[in-house]
């Protein structure tokens, strides 16, 4: 099952440049607006990344892939239990690559309707001197 999911995600990556994404990309100003409205943000990086850079205050920390790039088996099930498919959800990673893959999968294959990807991830957030909380 995990192998099939990983294969599916690789296919999504390969095809992602072919069309407009089915999710919305956010810049930092748009992200601040969404956070101000109470939209949850999921930081899908690994624990060592959270400790290295810090996280946006209020982020829900849930690792998507291990250090070998394998999708963690419980990730999608946990997300399905915590986020309704019609509720907005923001995804952030280091540079926006992992989250764009995940956002596409959530919208195209799992029926999520309001998925937001933070373009350029936490790297741009920090580069723009935005605040982070250290773990």
Predicted regions and their residues:
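Structural scaffold elements adjacent to functional motifs in cytosolic proteins
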Residues: 41-43
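Short, surface-exposed ligand- or partner-binding patches at beta-edge/loop junctions that are enriched
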Residues: 92-93
């Amino acid at each position: 099952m995990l192998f099939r999911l990983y294969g599916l995600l690789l296919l999504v990556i390969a095809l992602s440049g072919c069309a407009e994404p089915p999710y919305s990309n956010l810049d930092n100003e748009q992200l601040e607006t969404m956070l101000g409205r109470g939209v949850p943000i999921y930081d899908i990086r690994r624990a060592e990344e959270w400790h290295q850079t810090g996280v946006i205050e209020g982020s829900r920390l849930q690792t998507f892939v291990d250090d070998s790039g394998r999708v963690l088996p419980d990730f999608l099930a946990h997300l399905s239990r915590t986020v309704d498919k019609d509720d907005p959800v923001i995804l952030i990673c280091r540079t926006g690559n992992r989250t764009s893959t995940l956002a596409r999968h959530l919208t195209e294959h799992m029926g999520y309707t309001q998925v937001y990807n933070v373009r350029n991830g936490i790297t741009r957030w920090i580069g723009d001197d935005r605040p982070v909380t250290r773990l």
